[in-house]
Amino acid sequence: MAQQTPLYEQHNLCGARMVDFHGWMMPLHYGSQIDEHHAVRNDAGMFDVSHMTIVDLRGARTREFLRYLLANDVAKLTQPGKALYTAMLNASGGVIDDLIVYFMTEDYFRLVVNSATREKDLAWINEHAEPYGVSVTVRDDLSLIAVQGPNAKAKAATLFTDAQRKATEGMKPFFGVQADDLFIATTGYTGEAGYEIAMPNEKAAGFWSQLVEAGVKPCGLGARDTLRLEAGMNLYGQEMDEGVSPLAANMGWTIAWQPEDRAFIGRDALEAQRENGTEQLVGLVMTEKGVLRGELPVRFTDDQGNAREGIITSGTFSPTLGYSIALARVPAGIGDTAIVQIRNREMPVKVTKPIFVRAGKPVTQ
């Protein structure tokens, strides 16, 4: 039986179409995925992301532990509340999960990990935390609501206390702050400004209904996927998994190679991959009729005249741009164009950087 978040009844009240998403009953949409998408790009929308797992790590050696566990380096986190996006790798350099880590105090860090990978993540973290004497606490007592869009912060702030407004004033992207009973972070999965707000489960339903009254549109998994794809953000299980290197998933920027003497899980494998070369993640744009979908083959001829083939990892119709976009993992050597096989048709596509929309504006040329 699929689990329900504390907002399940709110979703039904808002007219959601519910689906089983990795063992959780979650809203796919509330009537129109397209309208929800546009609300986030142009105004403010909100998502129930309580199915994600919040993990608190405590202990004197927590920073040392995370410097070993994660490919990015928490030594960069010197200001309380600062957050970091990173991969957690296996020994062969594959991605166990991508996650956000927050520096709270010197002996207290917070992780937010994906729902689909929850059990293996927790097993991996617990296994490696033990030698460091780090305690691992899963915060199932917290709900998480993402409020996203150009007007999201202003509308969310109408629910804040004076202390919460003061705590979030002038907050830069990728920070989190505990303000009374809310943990408010300037993070998201849409390419828009906004907050991800963690709160006690018993407060979530009331907070959600107040956001509705403040003019924030409830949004489901469908809009969440088209928004993150436009923003060029990876989805675990599609752009990367335990068999895919972060170097092949446009995540090279999240690997902290310096200092050279920092040993982290997967480092040796990554260094070999960097030396030998890997596939790469690119963007695809198709302005002709049709929709690019995951698993479709991408074919091109490299500069040596060799026929090469990759695969679309995620594809959709872009509501913001009005045509189809995709992310694809391809061998090195791809040029500016390629061919995608859609049923029995060979469709020409333009190859771009793996990002299509930034702050509501097209970036694809």
From Swiss-Prot:
Pfam family, one: GCV_T_C
GO MF annotation list: aminomethyltransferase activity; transaminase activity
Reactions catalysed, as given in the entry: N(6)-[(R)-S(8)-aminomethyldihydrolipoyl]-L-lysyl-[protein] + (6S)-5,6,7,8-tetrahydrofolate = N(6)-[(R)-dihydrolipoyl]-L-lysyl-[protein] + (6R)-5,10-methylene-5,6,7,8-tetrahydrofolate + NH4(+)
EC number(s) on file: 2.1.2.10
Tree of life domain: Bacteria
Sequence intervals crossing the membrane: none
InterPro entries for the chain: GCS_T, GCS_T_bac, GCST_C, GCV_T_N, GcvT/YgfZ/DmdA, GcvT/YgfZ_C, TrmE/GcvT_dom1
Keyword field: Aminotransferase, Transferase
GO CC list: cytosol; glycine cleavage complex
Protein family (similarity comment): Belongs to the GcvT family.
NCBIfam families: gcvT, PRK00389.1
Protein name per UniProt: Aminomethyltransferase
Taxonomic source organism: Cronobacter sakazakii (strain ATCC BAA-894) (Enterobacter sakazakii)
Gene symbol of the encoding locus: gcvT
